[in-house]
Amino acid sequence: MKNLRNRSFLTLLDFSRQEVEFLLTLSEDLKRAKYIGTEKPMLKNKNIALLFEKDSTRTRCAFEVAAHDQGAHVTYLGPTGSQMGKKETAKDTARVLGGMYDGIEYRGFSQRTVETLAQYSGVPVWNGLTDEDHPTQVLADFLTAKEVLKKEYADINFTYVGDGRNNVANALMQGAAIMGMNFHLVCPKELNPTEELLNRCERIATENGGNILITDDIDKGVKDSDVIYTDVWVSMGEPDEVWQERLKLLKPYQVNQALLEKTGNPNVIFEHCLPSFHNAETKIGQQIYEKYGISEMEVTDDVFESKASVVFQEAENRMHTIKAVMVATLGEF
């Protein structure tokens, strides 16, 4: 699979089914090698820049540990750590970093920014999250589902419940279409994905033997699901009126025990990209409770802590799948 060498990883839509399967298989191989102590560093003497406009726990740790395991050196540039967007354009930053580093990870706001970095840096660029997409997350989600369910990807009934327009929902729909999955997106009509993205994903799903269903009918949408997935309903910094409207729309779509039972599948698993507002024990969770009287948002605490929940295995797999992306695009095989 040498054709992934020097490729950027900006969106799953840039990759074929065979290429995504290769990345997932490589993730399994690298994970196994790490566990049994036979991992071989394939990124020796590589220098990697982590460019973060948004803070993160999982994405930063996954990239740093993966790079260290593989022998690479990392420079972390946080939200105040570079001049990009303030005194320097993304195009100029790309050319500066591209002259010093062998690869660049970007986590921030605009998909256009990560595309600009890839266009002008001359080195592989990896999308750690934008407002529109989150491709590295989906690799971890799919790997976890396969590990736990013991099913091939095309045999998994994958259901996302919640805000159908957000970056994780977008990325999951893309990935499911590419892998030929049966994918359900259960959300209020007001929060459906864009027609443009939906039409493109439906075409890809048809080509790969998959299926996509968009519905606001919870009973219909979750029936026979193997995976129930959700994400946060709102983002920090959005105005109060947006919060109120979003909470009103999404409250019926909370992932709780009753919703899991509607799947009719006693072995259904629960996934979440994290962090999650499943209780009021965080600063923001407490603020939400005080302002809106809600102690559990997108998922209830009992589901989050249940045997169905695989969120921490999923979080670990961020590291293994991100390692696979870096090795495949930058490594010396």
From Swiss-Prot:
GO terms for biological process: arginine biosynthetic process via ornithine; citrulline biosynthetic process; L-arginine biosynthetic process. L-ornithine binds at N167, D231, S235, M236. InterPro entries: Asp/Orn_carbamoyltranf_P-bd, Asp/Orn_carbamoylTrfase, Asp/Orn_carbamoylTrfase_sf, Asp_carbamoyltransf_Asp/Orn-bd, Orn/put_carbamltrans, OTCase_ArgI. It comes from the Bacteria. GO terms for molecular function: amino acid binding; ornithine carbamoyltransferase activity. It catalyses: carbamoyl phosphate + L-ornithine = L-citrulline + phosphate + H(+). Its main location: cytoplasm. It is an enzyme of class 2 (transferase). Keywords: Amino-acid biosynthesis, Arginine biosynthesis, Cytoplasm, Transferase. Carbamoyl phosphate binds at S56, T57, R58, T59, Q83, R107, H134, P135, T136, Q137, C273, L274, R318. It is found in: Cytoplasm. Transmembrane segments: none annotated. GO terms for cellular component: cytoplasm. Gene3D superfamilies: Aspartate/ornithine carbamoyltransferase. Belongs to the aspartate/ornithine carbamoyltransferase superfamily. OTCase family. PANTHER family: ORNITHINE CARBAMOYLTRANSFERASE, ORNITHINE CARBAMOYLTRANSFERASE, MITOCHONDRIAL. This is Ornithine carbamoyltransferase. The gene is argF.
